[in-house]
Amino acid sequence: MRWTPSVLFNQIKYCCGNQEIEDIDIDRQSKANTFDCFPLMFIKNNDIPKKEIPGLANFEGNCYLNSILQCFYYCKDLTNFFIKKENEIIKKGGKLSNAYLDLILRLNKKEKYNDAKILLNTLKEVSYNFFKKGGNDPKAALFYLLENLHNELKEQNLDYNEEDICCEDIDQEKAFQKYKKNEENNKSIISELFNWCLLTKNECKKCKNFHYICESQNNILISLNKYETENKNVILDDLIKFYFKDDEKHFICNSDKEIFKVKFTKKIISLPQYLIIILNRNIIQFNIIYEDCIDLSEYCVNENNVKYKFIGASLTNDYENKEGTHAISRCMTPEGSCIFSDLITMKNCKDINEYNPYILFYEKMQ
């Protein structure tokens, strides 16, 4: 069973105080190929839709990716940038930039159905990991979207070679200064709002020693929030799955029920306007207390005491436990916190799809 518009709409009614709202009447069978993917958006009491919510029409079964795209739409700084730069992007922008601009303009019309086909087809053309054999990989498309929008919009290319600073007599201060220089020449609206780089302690391929190197920008953002599990203090980014272009160069934290291990030592260099936290779905096997996850959904604070407000989430469609297969609804309260309708019961899961993690979006509070 997959989540349906009526399930989601009932959640919205609940989080808005059970107000009397006319239900959505959608015949799913008659719209099998255009099943609505409703947006994750701020729902205000005075503008709750009476009959329907504008959203993205589904494309090749990719409602999960559509919810990610709608989260990006509600990152107002990014959306406003594309709207203000519309003419310039049309004239000088790359293929992906223009496709993303098209999506924003469609969503801006607030129509019932919006087609993300142009953007999704562009991703399909150039991202080898987007459509995998046997299913889609929306997480790969998310990384590709951020990385390549950055590459198309940045002022100049990053002049960086890992081997330049990866050697036996590595000078960490020089490595840091080289990163700062590269950072100045590698800015775009994407890097300013989303990407921070990390100084990563990693094994050198040449000398086999561990050194601090500058991690490339195709790593998605992480957060250093902490929360309590069963008598354990766990760093949230221990649960993050890193994705690299090269399938052989990927990192998934090795964890068990007794102890959480992290391969990399991380250091924040700068603070972004937005956080994107990717939780590997396998964390549900580690006896995480999900009430803590719900608490974190309202806001989070990083190690520098900068507070971020939750603005959206993209959650997996379904899961299977001892009682059968259930759906997780995607929606938000008027205050901006997320409703994880079935998340707590996921301790009973038996079969977990590896493609769809939980992706949470936060915006820095003023």
Identify the residue ranges that each predicted region occupies.
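USP/UBP deubiquitinase core
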Residues: R2-P5, I12-E168, I276-I277, F361-M365
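Short, recurring structural edge motifs at helix starts
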Residues: S188-E192
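Low-complexity, polar/charged sequence tracts that form flexible coils or short amphipathic helices
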Residues: N195-W196
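Residues immediately within or flanking Cys/His clusters that coordinate Zn2+
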Residues: L199-K201, H250
